[in-house]
Swiss-Prot record:
Gene: rev
Residues spanned by motif Nuclear export signal and binding to XPO1: 69-80
Native species: Human immunodeficiency virus type 2 subtype B (isolate D205) (HIV-2)
Name of the protein: Protein Rev
Organism lineage string: Viruses, Riboviria, Pararnavirae, Artverviricota, Revtraviricetes
Classification via InterPro entries: REV_protein
Major site of localization recorded for this protein: host cell
Region called Disordered, residue ranges: 18-40, 79-153
Residue ranges of the region described as Homomultimerization: 14-22
Length: 153
């Protein structure tokens, strides 16, 4: 372990200790007492973050070696071309050998509207009024007439 790694480990241990010394406030009390505890906890947390910035400033440049390794790895990457789609895409999937068609070329099946949903259109405004009750084809209404039951006292 180099001296720089040792210093970094020391700083990280110190920062971890600082964060452990400020647990989230818990306990009984009125709403204002709990609110004040949370405010004090938040202020202490901000002070810890400011102290952490002073302990470990990230302005130091990283070592040259890892950057060179990362550049070499990026240079070794290649982009492969997608294979041409197979000519037998229109066949049913049971006649094809499983796994021979890459997922990029899977055939999309269009969705069809459900046949049993009478009155449900794309716009909810176009729904017919007979959706709330039984059959309305005979012209009867399910709504109660307010004048009908006025005999109650």
């Amino acid at each position: 372990m180099t001296a720089r790694e040792g210093d970094l480990q020391k700083e990280l241990r110190l920062l971890h200790l600082l964060h452990q010394t400020n647990p989230y406030p818990q306990g009984p009390g009125t709403a204002s007492q709990r609110r004040n505890r949370r405010r004090r906890w938040k202020r202490r947390g901000l002070q810890i973050l400011a102290l952490a910035d002073r302990i470990h400033s990230f302005s130091t440049a990283p070592a040259e070696e890892p950057l060179n390794l990362a550049i070499q790895r990026l240079q070794n990457l290649t982009v492969e071309d997608l294979p041409n789609p197979p000519p037998n895409l229109n066949q049913s999937p049971t006649t094809q050998a499983p796994g021979c068609v890459p997922p990029v070329w899977d055939q999309l099946v269009p969705r069809s509207a459900p046949s049993g949903s009478k009155g449900y259109g794309r716009n909810s405004c176009e729904c017919r009024r007979d959706l709330m009750g039984g059959s309305q084809e005979s012209g009867e209404s399910n709504h109660r007439d307010p004048q009908e039951n006025q005999t109650r006292t």
